[in-house]
Amino acid sequence: MSKDRSSNFELLRLLCIFGILMMHTFGGIDTSVSFFNTEIHVLVNSIFNMGVTCFILLSGYFGIRFDFKKLIRLDLMIIFFTIFGTIAVGNLGIKALIKSCIPVISRYYWFISCYFFLCFLTPFLNQIPEKLSKENFEKLLAVLLLLFSVIPTFGFFEIMQDGGKGLVHMVMIYLLGRYLALYHNRSHNTGRLFLGLFLSIGFIFLADSSLTFVRGKLYTTFCGDCSIFIIFGSVMVLLLFRELNFHSRFINRAAGNVLAVYVLDGTVQTFLLKWIDFKPYAGSWFLVFLAIGYALAIMIIACLSVSYTHLTLPTNREV
């Protein structure tokens, strides 16, 4: 089930973590003081919140082979960097130290916790497309998407009450990735894929932007993790990057630090925010460029920290 990943997918992973950092950066800035920057904030969420879904789609597309030893190694590396980050920022409270010692169980990072539990389920999840016919597999995905994406997107009710940041959503997207790998492995028209992506982002932006304007505060329902438009856009992104075919040792090596960047994000931001204050620039037209530089700085510092410790976090392709 495992396949060698060329640099097109590794580049996608780098862009995904960059997008997540951009959202985290804008999330800490009060953009309400500027209509322009509020719109930029909505646009950032509309585009980059596809990052998490793309990560899970990639896991499903290539399939996870459960390996308990590698999972333990992953856990130990995450514990090391979490404890390092907790101590480095001076958070020496008993509760914080205990949580940092058990980051997976304590849901210190929701994505990593859910990913761990997903790994334990994959020996069974991987049998679903093997046991079900294509028609029944499509029916299963349709029901899952209806219950846990379509209905929550349009605000009727949300069964899981987690905004898509939970195990049920991750299982659903993983299975969708398996479906794409098995039944959509042919070449697609890139023009149509771009159109689908553009329409998805456009609807999310217009809907959330309009509601933000009417309600007077940032509205994020249509760009949430469980949004059907985010899921559709993420599928378009995955299929677009699959059409690329190139190899870069630099990109492949850099992509190996993606998980470390995610884990160290909070720690690096805590240090940087001691010297960087975005508040004076919240109304400036160049705020987005400052945010881009800030996100890139976090990625570089996190990667250098990993290199300095001579430790590497195994990527999800290794589990």
Show the residue positions of the predicted features:
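N-terminal membrane topogenic signal
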Residues: 2-15
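Specific transmembrane alpha-helix
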Residues: 49-65, 111-126, 154-187, 226-246, ...
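Solvent-exposed interhelical
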Residues: 67-70, 120-144, 179-196
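Alpha-helical membrane-inserting segments
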Residues: 84, 88, 121, 125, ...
